[in-house]
Amino acid sequence: MKVLLIGSGGREHAMAWKFAQSPKITELLIAPGNAGTAEVGTNVDIGVDDHADIVEFAKNEKIGLVVVAPDQPIVDGLCDLLRQSGITTFGPSAAAARIEGSKIWSDDLMTKYA
């Protein structure tokens, strides 16, 4: 299976390192990646905020799974957009990520149910 991992930090490096060990993954692409991810997969020059480009790339490359790791693209709805485009995606919806993305909203929620 071809996997596209979104992100460029240490979390993504650790995930890429582990993904690369799986015999089920035939190709690992990381957008945009970093020097560490380049050692275990192929970095792709697409920014985490370029949602339309990510969807287009995933479709063109016949990606079997997209894993969205950074918080901001999740909060901005990247996982939702990928799913709406028919692409298998690992990551929460924007609605589910709201508790992480808005401290005011999460504080209000916790106060309401405290």
What are these regions (language model features)?
Residues 85, 109-114:
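Rossmann-like NAD(P)H-binding beta-loop-alpha module
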Residues 1-95, 100, 104-105:
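ATP-binding N-terminal substructure of ATP-dependent carboxylate-amine bond-forming enzymes
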